[in-house]
């Protein structure tokens, strides 16, 4: 499985049967590596008490780091223990999994990537990249914007200081929401679904503060395109939108434009409907986007499927435990690919050594 974060950073996921590794190429020599940030990003995927078999464990740095900084060689992160072995023969297709597509493309006996282990390795890489960005003054955070009828309070899209404070307040929360009452409602909703052997989908909203203007490219490798491409590679993602996103369909151009203002020697905008990016380039405002995750397909209820050998319809019941809130665990992976994509765009300015240049654009 290959992840191309941009023009320079690439990563490959390799499953050897005895372990899983993520190899990342393109990191500059001398970039500080915060091991605590890496482990913290993975730990935030928990707790795993209700489903210990899905606990991916803690990744380790195998190579590419010496003395707390990158060497310029590929960074290798590893997890002990392999994924489930490839099944012998064809099994009934699981509804809304990619079993049917894998069978149509490669036939039987394909090893299915473990979503939790994939997420853990991406979260680990993201923890390293995110800490490096923080050293440049770039801060990011993610909250649960919606699950069912439960909605969190909206983020202050233009007030950088207030937004930074709210993002900081999300750290360490099992249910990262700014509205404490909403968090309790969500907790009750998750408990109800868990007791019924069901799963829930949700929307994660990510904000990045203090990005310089002009980061990205005005083409298919722009900041929105690069982020969307990598976010859609995460298990369960079904939608990505920036700023107003699909809400732009309800607006006229005169309502949808972010009008420019001059403040204290820098250029900003009165609003942030575009979500901090226009035409593939950042505009200096906070970068804000939402990622929608479908409910995990494995549920206690009996589902209808088709036996690939006999082509007969049959009933299928998935074995538990069931991942009721898979979207909550995905926060680290979302921030992981976000940090990797943004780091790649920064490296375009000065790719050979750390720190990479901030450019001439001033962030608000």
Question: What is each stretch, according to the model?
Answer:
Residues 1-364:
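Generic N-terminal targeting/processing segments that precede catalytic cores or assembly contacts
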């Amino acid at each position: 499985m290959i992840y191309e974060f941009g023009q320079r950073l690439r990563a490959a996921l390799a499953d050897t049967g005895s372990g899983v590794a993520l190899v990342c190429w393109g990191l500059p020599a001398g970039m500080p590596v915060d091991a605590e940030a890496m482990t913290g990003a993975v730990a935030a995927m928990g707790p795993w008490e209700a489903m210990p078999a899905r606990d991916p464990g803690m990744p380790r740095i195998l190579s590419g780091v010496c003395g707390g900084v990158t060497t310029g060689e590929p960074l290798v992160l590893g997890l002990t223990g392999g994924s489930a072995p490839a099944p012998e023969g064809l099994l009934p297709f699981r509804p809304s999994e990619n079993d049917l597509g894998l069978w149509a493309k490669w036939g039987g006996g394909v090893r299915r990537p473990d979503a939790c282990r994939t997420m853990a390795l991406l979260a680990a890489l993201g923890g390293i990249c995110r800490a490096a960005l923080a050293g440049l003054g770039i801060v990011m955070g993610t909250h649960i914007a919606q699950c069912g009828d439960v909605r969190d309070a909206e983020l202050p899209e233009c007030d950088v200081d207030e937004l930074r404070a709210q993002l900081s307040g999300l750290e360490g929360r099992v249910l990262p929401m700014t509205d404490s009452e909403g968090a309790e409602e969500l907790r009750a909703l998750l408990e109800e679904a868990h007791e019924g052997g069901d799963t829930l989908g949700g929307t994660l909203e990510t904000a990045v503060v203090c990005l310089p203007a002009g980061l990205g490219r005005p083409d298919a490798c722009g900041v929105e395109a690069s982020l969307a491409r990598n976010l859609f590679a995460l298990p369960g993602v079904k939608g990505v939108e920036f700023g107003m996103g699909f809400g732009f369909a309800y607006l006229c151009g005169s309502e949808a434009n972010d009008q420019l203002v001059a403040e204290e020697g820098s250029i900003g905008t009165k609003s942030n409907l575009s979500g901090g990016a226009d035409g593939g380039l950042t505009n200096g405002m906070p970068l804000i986007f939402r990622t929608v995750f479908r409910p995990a397909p494995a549920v206690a209820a009996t589902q209808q499927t088709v036996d690939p050998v006999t082509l007969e319809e049959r009933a299928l019941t998935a074995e538990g435990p069931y991942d009721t809130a898979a979207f909550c665990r995905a926060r680290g992976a979302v921030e992981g690919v976000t940090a990797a994509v943004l780091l790649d765009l920064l490296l375009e300015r000065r790719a050979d050594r750390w720190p990479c240049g901030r450019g001439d654009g001033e962030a608000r």
